[in-house]
A protein has these predicted regions:
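TRNA-recognition modules of translation machinery and tRNA-sensing kinases, especially anticodon-binding
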Residues: 1-221
């Protein structure tokens, strides 16, 4: 992976963001070559699905009101469990820390993760100490607000593009003259406040998405 990341960087495909100010993990820039590749991939994807007569393209906002994401379950359930090192303050995904000791670490509860970390004497990858806070859930969405001061509404940067298509379902249903099936596709940015982004571009805090939602009548698919 490190060799691939180094090659992409040298060739101007993908580079670390804000590097002259120390960089920010989980954020990348697309260089001259990477930007062209990305544009062509997106255009090809849209062209492919656009050939289907009952699939349309939409474009919805990156900022999503809290009420939408409460209804979708993201506010309560869009979490990863985090373990913080008391010695140096570094934070890591708990399931990543125990991945060598359990086949399905993402299924473990916070208490089970704590027990496994203690049993195996897992050391902090940053400082090599064994001194952990209890694992706790961390919501992965970036929170913001809409409006000024007292009149503001809680909102989030969207964790995925799907909600925009679901919100437009009534309008799309009218567009297709109240007939199913039909589909909506969307490309754009998604945002997830990853606890410990790593592995190059596999876990990013801001990333490109391409999604298609296809709506059918379950009684007459």
């Amino acid at each position: 992976m490190s060799r691939l990341v180094s090659l992409l960087r040298r060739r101007g495909v993908v580079l670390p963001s804000f590097e002259i100010y120390g960089g920010v993990s989980g954020l990348v820039d697309y260089g001259p070559v990477g930007a062209r590749i990305k544009r062509r991939v997106i255009e090809s994807w849209i062209e492919h699905w656009g050939r289907i007569t009952n699939v349309v393209e939409i474009d919805s906002p990156n900022i999503t009101p809290e009420s939408v994401l409460i209804a979708s379950g993201h506010v309560g359930e869009f979490n990863d469990k985090m373990s913080e090192c008391l010695a140096c303050g570094s934070a890591f995904r708990s399931d990543h820390l125990v991945s060598d000791f359990h086949e399905a670490p993402d299924t473990l509860s916070s208490s089970e993760l704590d027990e496994l970390i203690e049993e195996e004497g897992i050391r902090c990858p940053s400082c090599d100490k064994v001194d952990w806070k209890e694992a706790m859930p961390m919501n992965l969405m970036f929170q913001t607000s809409i409006g000024a001061m007292g009149g503001s509404r809680t909102a989030f940067l969207r964790p995925e593009t799907a909600q925009g298509m679901f919100m437009l379902f009534p309008a799309l249903y009218r567009h297709f003259r109240q007939k199913l099936p039909f589909g909506a596709m969307q490309t754009g940015k998604g945002y997830r406040n990853e606890i410990s982004p790593r592995q190059g571009m596999i876990r990013l805090r801001e990333f490109n998405m391409a999604e298609l939602e296809y709506f059918i009548d379950p009684d007459d698919p």
